[in-house]
Amino acid sequence: MAIERYFIKEGVKEMLIDEFLEKELRRAGYGGLDIKKTPLGTKVTIFAANPGYVIGRGGRRIRELTRILEKQFGLENPQIEVEEIKNPYLNAKVQAVRLAQALERGIHFRRAAYSAIRAIMRNGARGVEIRLSGKLTGERAKSVRFYQGYLAKVGNPAETLVSRGYAQAQLKLGVIGVKVSIMPPDAKLPDEIEIKEIVEEEVSANEAQ
């Protein structure tokens, strides 16, 4: 039970750090983080479309983030690395944050969702799903789903191949939850066969039957 409590505590801590970094690094195109314990302390990898913003002028911002992760969140000797997101349109976290920002700017939820889906698919995604939950049009909360293309929903492919991201939009009517799921262009399903070129081969009489 002690081990279970430890992992629950660590999971909650990582979630709180993710929420903090999302707010601090929205202008950097924040796309999530990875936390790993090492013999020397804690390695924190921040994924961002604009690494320069995370680092800051003269390294000022990354030093401040390091201090906060250690003092406020209790990470042992945090070492921050920043990894650039090559294509932000295929990172679900980046897209969730951008969609939340669009909603906060007053763009209608349907227009914002369709615009995001078109941009994601134009960048080669095999499929995308967007779920918006909250008071979208009035006092009554509801959930709306938008999708296009193919997206693995269950099993190992859904867990390992699909990029998922979550963000929140703070509106006058309340908080809107934004969930984005993206199937990237290079996702290969276990039972999928892809033939790029026409193949010609001889077949024996027995095989032909």
From Swiss-Prot:
GO molecular function, one term: structural constituent of ribosome
CDD domains xrefs: KH-II_30S_S3_arch
Protein keywords: Ribonucleoprotein, Ribosomal protein, RNA-binding, rRNA-binding
Matches recorded under HAMAP family: Ribosomal_uS3_A
Full protein name: Small ribosomal subunit protein uS3
Keyword rRNA-binding (UniProt): yes
Pfam families assigned: KH_2, Ribosomal_S3_C
GO biological process: translation
The keyword Thylakoid appears for this protein: no
Subunit structure, as described in the record: Part of the 30S ribosomal subunit.
InterPro entries linked: KH_dom, KH_dom-like_a/b, KH_dom_type_2, KH_sf_prok-type, Ribosomal_S3_C_sf, Ribosomal_uS3_arc, Ribosomal_uS3_C, Ribosomal_uS3_euk/arc
Coiled coil residues, start to end: none
Source organism superkingdom: Archaea
Family: Belongs to the universal ribosomal protein uS3 family.
Free-text function comment from the UniProt entry: Binds the lower part of the 30S subunit head.
Cellular component aspect of the GO annotation: cytosolic small ribosomal subunit
KH type-2 domain location: 17-86
